[in-house]
């Protein structure tokens, strides 16, 4: 094989490897809620996990990697309710009141729209049990 073909083959291989690696990195077990309709769809599920927080919250930055790791291990998905981005939603106060959100981060387990358990940064050790609850 000529030198030019070897170089081209090698570059194509590296490009493919890079594409595969980048594609895997973008996948997250945490899905953002972008509007009120998406929120309603989440709470209509039999079982769902609702994660309250905001991007520049230092406690959320500590909590989120722990949450992501546990979600990956259990195959669960959490729906992210960004308390700063959703503040103008008509149902914002109702949502926070319904789940007793006084501070973030907070992960709430919902069963048929009702909160049946939650964890925060102080109780993060209980996260595996919350995600494994039947």
Give residue spans per PLM region.
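Non-catalytic, surface beta->alpha helical segment in thiol-disulfide oxidoreductase systems
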Residues: 108-134
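Bacterial N-terminal signal peptides that target proteins for export
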Residues: 2-10
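Proteins that catalyze or organize thiol-disulfide redox chemistry
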Residues: 2, 23-49, 56, 134
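Thiol-based oxidoreductase modules, predominantly thioredoxin-like and allied folds used
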Residues: 76-90
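Solvent-exposed loop/turn segments at secondary-structure junctions
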Residues: 55-59, 84-86, 114-115
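C-terminal motif of bacterial Sec signal peptides marking the signal peptidase cleavage site
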Residues: 18-21
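Local sequence-structure signature of Cys/Sec-based thiol-disulfide redox active-site neighborhoods
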Residues: 39-76
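Structural micro-motif
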Residues: 96-108
């Amino acid at each position: 094989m000529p030198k030019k073909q070897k170089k081209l083959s090698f570059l194509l291989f590296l490009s493919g490897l890079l594409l595969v690696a980048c594609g895997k990195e973008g996948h997250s077990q945490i899905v953002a809620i972008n509007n009120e309709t998406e929120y309603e769809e989440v709470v209509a599920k039999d079982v769902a996990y609702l994660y309250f927080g905001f991007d520049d919250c230092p406690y959320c930055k500590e909590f989120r990697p722990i949450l992501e790791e546990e979600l990956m291990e259990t195959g669960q998905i959490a729906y992210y309710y960004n308390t700063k981005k959703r503040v103008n939603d008509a149902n914002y106060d109702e949502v926070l009141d319904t789940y007793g959100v006084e501070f973030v981060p907070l992960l709430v387990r919902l069963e048929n729209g009702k909160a049946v358990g939650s964890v925060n940064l102080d109780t993060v050790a209980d996260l595996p049990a919350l995600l494994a609850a039947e």
